[in-house]
């Protein structure tokens, strides 16, 4: 499963993140968008592990409260639904 995720992350574009965020009512400014893109590209393994709190702390410092809350909600939702696959 991790190879499949890695291949997806390798192909992920900043526009993919922008479209996904808008679809989920998350309005990111360019700085936030770049930060999330770089975080996903560089730290996706940590996000998929049980040691993801460090990454969430970084997000909290670099996103608006509203965007952070929405992203954390989605993160936990998908972690709960699909975490068993990892």
Which sequence ranges carry the predicted segments?
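Long, compositionally biased
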Residues: 49-80
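N-terminal acidic leader/helix
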Residues: 5-35
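Short acidic DE-rich linear segments
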Residues: 2-3, 79-86
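A ubiquitous short alpha-helical element
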Residues: 1-8, 40-44
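Amphipathic alpha-helical segments that form the core helices of the histone-fold
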Residues: 34-45, 57
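Alpha-helix C-capping/helix-to-loop hinge sites
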Residues: 20-24, 43, 62
């Amino acid at each position: 499963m991790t190879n499949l995720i890695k291949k997806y992350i390798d192909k992920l574009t900043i526009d993919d993140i922008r479209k996904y965020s808008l679809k989920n009512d998350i309005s990111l400014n360019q700085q936030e968008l770049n930060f999330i893109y770089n975080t996903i590209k560089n730290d996706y393994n940590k996000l998929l592990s049980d040691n993801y709190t460090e990454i969430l702390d970084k997000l909290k410092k670099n996103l608006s409260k509203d965007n952070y809350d929405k992203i954390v909600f989605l993160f936990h939702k998908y972690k709960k639904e699909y975490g068993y696959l990892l």
